[in-house]
Amino acid sequence: MKALVWVAVGGALGAIVRYFFYKFVPQVYDFPLATFLVNVVASFLLGFIIGAFEAKPWGQQLKLALATGFCGALSTFSTFAADNYILLRSSKYITAFVYTAVSVGLGIVSVALGEDLAQRLLK
């Protein structure tokens, strides 16, 4: 039960941060910039958390709060999928392709960069 509380606390904070991204990041043309940014930032943070907890074991509860709760609530695959559906339905095929390719590619790179940064900082 305690684990659920940690996930819920992290999730609440992640959802609040995501809300502020959507409130303050403007949409650029047809590109869903806020969704793109929250997913890249969450990927970087998750990579950092992975690297940090490999370098120093800070406890499973904190890891649950940060990785599962915060990063899970900050990132949003369902919105990513819906954004792409809307782009495709609107015949914006190139934008949908670029959004998908750059989101997935940069997401993977962000995880790797976050993990590397954490390991360098925490040696």
UniProtKB/Swiss-Prot annotation:
UniProt-listed NCBIfam families: crcB
UniProt key word Cytoplasm: no
Domain of life: Archaea
Membrane topology: Multi-pass membrane protein
Main localization (coarse): membrane
Residue stretches spanning the membrane: 5-25, 33-53, 62-82, 94-114
Function description: Fluoride-specific ion channel. Important for reducing fluoride concentration in the cell, thus reducing its toxicity.
Protein name as it appears in the record: Fluoride-specific ion channel FluC
Coiled coil: none
Entry's Gene Ontology cellular component terms: plasma membrane
Entry's family note: Belongs to the fluoride channel Fluc/FEX (TC 1.A.43) family.
Keywords: Cell inner membrane, Cell membrane, Ion channel, Ion transport, Membrane, Metal-binding, Sodium, Transmembrane, Transmembrane helix, Transport
InterPro entries hit by this protein: FluC
Organism of derivation: Ignicoccus hospitalis (strain KIN4/I / DSM 18386 / JCM 14125)
Gene Ontology BP annotations: cellular detoxification of fluoride
PANTHER family, A to Z: FLUORIDE EXPORT PROTEIN 1-RELATED
Regulation: Na(+) is not transported, but it plays an essential structural role and its presence is essential for fluoride channel function.
Compartment(s) where it occurs, according to its Swiss-Prot or TrEMBL record: Cell inner membrane
Catalytic activity: fluoride(in) = fluoride(out)
Annotated Pfam families: CRCB
Name of the gene encoding the protein in the UniProt record: fluC
Binding-site positions, Na(+): G72, S75
Gene Ontology MF term list: fluoride channel activity; metal ion binding
